[in-house]
Amino acid sequence: MADAAIRTCYAAGMDPDVLRIKTRLYSGNEIAMGPGKADLLEAIAQHGSISAAGRALGMSYRRTWLLVDAMNRCWREPLVQTAAGGSHGGGAQLTPLGHSVLGDYRALQKRLSAAAADAPEQAALVAALLPDPRPTRD
């Protein structure tokens, strides 16, 4: 975040991270990649399992599997490769395209956040934003 925006946040008693950029890539109407799906890919790479990745992220196995299925349907090749269970256990790993998409997505997130941090519009938005929303009227 630009220095002016940070100073404005602190002066207003607000968290300097109040404006966050969320990058989503779409395939048709389906979110092909977003912050949560990138976190899931990282967890699968770390744990080697869809179920373990879901547990680490506090997601049900069904939710985790649906997200993996959605990602695999949105790209020219699957991002996650699975192996069936059995006596040796199953598992999951990122494909080469999965590693590439994850790396490119994280780099794009970083670049877009840096560009927004330097934008004077961000300081103006922070200056106009309330620290907390007003209560609703009953």
Language model: regions and residue ranges:
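Alpha-helical linker/hinge and terminal dimerization helices associated
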Residues: 104-123
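Central "turn" residue of the DNA-binding helix-turn-helix
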Residues: 58-60
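Basic, amphipathic "hinge/linker" alpha-helix immediately C-terminal to the N-terminal HTH DNA-binding motif
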Residues: 82-107
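C-terminal regulatory/oligomerization modules of transcriptional regulators
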Residues: 118-138
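Residues within the DNA-recognition helix of helix-turn-helix
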Residues: 67
